[in-house]
């Protein structure tokens, strides 16, 4: 597969990395947020270096949008590596209580030692939530805090400044903008990030992204693809598949010619709004 180089390291991300590194000494535990649909592709390869030896829990967010069977496989995969991983949904709150409980258990011995050294009462756990843009960091913070504090949106990179937020008496959160590597070494990773909306639609050619997505759907979810677009069968030729979908859905330009840009936008919108059901693009 050809190497795809994309420069993607905005100034605010470089600043976030620097500030996170400076503040790690204040933090007890790290919540690493990933997209449950792409748990590996949405991880930052620098995260191990940045987090170093801090206790960590991987949160597979947007689990309500991911294939539940595949999500369970990923949770088991991380568990086999002695990494706690929890499937959550920051929108509905599924799994959120569990993440706090697991964090308390992971830090139990540390706090017991602090108490033994004379700390009169346990202080709040200090946690860092980190992840690439658009995996739901701000939504999770709002869910934990019970109010709208962090600015949220569907534009990657919307969270700009770090902030401490108290969540009851047990938890203090440092929200930090997502960190994404400066270039993708793997073309497929880029397409997965684009398909799920983790990177801006202006970064990659949308037709190329849709080609990737349709081929994936044809391989892993053919019945859903046929049902959604009323296809009798799925042609092997990708151009024919674009044509079939375009004609069925009226994605036409002047003269009745299929508008491939419109088809690409339709398919990606359908994926992102769950019109094709719960999908997982990273596979073990």
From Swiss-Prot:
Subcellular location: Cytoplasm
GO cellular component terms, semicolon-separated: cytoplasm
Biological process per Gene Ontology, one example term: ribosome biogenesis
RNA-binding keyword on record: yes
Binding residues annotated for GTP, in chain numbering: 61-64, 134-139, 178
Keywords assigned: Cytoplasm, GTP-binding, Hydrolase, Nucleotide-binding, Ribosome biogenesis, RNA-binding
UniProt keyword Cytoplasm present: yes
All residue ranges annotated as the CP-type G domain in the record: 17-182
GO terms for MF: GTP binding; GTPase activity; RNA binding
Protein name per the record: Ribosome biogenesis GTPase A
Source species of the chain: Anoxybacillus flavithermus (strain DSM 21510 / WK1)
